[in-house]
UniProtKB/Swiss-Prot annotation:
Pfam families: NPL. Induction: By fertilization. Residues 97-269 are annotated as: Disordered. Predominantly expressed in ovaries. Accumulates predominantly in the micropylar region of the ovule's integument. Belongs to the histone deacetylase HD2 family. Signal peptide: none annotated. Its main location: nucleus. One of its GO terms (cellular component) is nucleolus. This is Histone deacetylase HDT1. Keywords: Chromatin regulator, Hydrolase, Metal-binding, Nucleus, Phosphoprotein, Repressor, Transcription, Transcription regulation, Zinc, Zinc-finger. Mediates the deacetylation of lysine residues on the N-terminal part of the core histones (H2A, H2B, H3 and H4). Histone deacetylation gives a tag for epigenetic repression and plays an important role in transcriptional regulation, cell cycle progression and developmental events.
Amino acid sequence: MEFWGAEVKSGEPLTVQPGDGMVLHLSQASLGELKKDKSESVCLSVNIDGKKLVLGTLNSEKVPQQQFDLVFDRDFELSHNLKSGSVYFFGYKATNPFEEEEDDEDDYDESDEDIPLTLANSGKPEPKEAGKSNAGKDSASGKQKVRIVEPTKDDEDESSDDDDSDMGEDEDDSDDSEEETPKKAEPAKRRKADSATKTPVTDKKAKLTTPQKTDGKKGGGHVATPHPSKQASKTPKSAGSHHCKPCNRSFGSEGALDSHSKAKHSAGK
């Protein structure tokens, strides 16, 4: 930023040049000393691009100075209609921000233009070439697939061996299943054997219970079911036992009693 000021005399317009890449900010205008007709109004003008515009009006008694907020980025000319005297203009110079923005926009536009070119050159090939390349890729991929699918002799041998082993395993499994099937019939045989063994037991029970019922009818009271072994042991006693009174022992036959008495009692006599 640079301070700027200029004096514009009566009848002498002043041409102002902001400079390359610079702008001029017009901030203020004020009247100088007036020697004659102090109540006279002074009209301030600017001429830019061949057009003359009024900036404002000054009066030494009422409006001796006036503030502006005008920015010029090109050459312009200042003037006034004061007959005798001078008007002073003030402001400052600075770099042109609009020009920098325009440069940035130009650079941005150029970068935008470059992007499609690079994409067209690298990312988007011509349709014919794309078709050819795709056809080449498809043919190459097809060849690769054919090579992958074709089995070698070793693979065929291995696959046949695997099939034979699988068939052998299946046959072994089937043989095992056939051998195991007769085992399932064993429970039926066992049931038949059990039923055959159980049937005579029922007959024995029937034989044992029949005399009990006849005894029950004779007694007319509660008949206890005797154990078969106990009945068998009691039957020889009921048939007739031979007792030895001195010893208080019983024998099954007379011969046994005689031999006992001869051995024990005759020896004592």
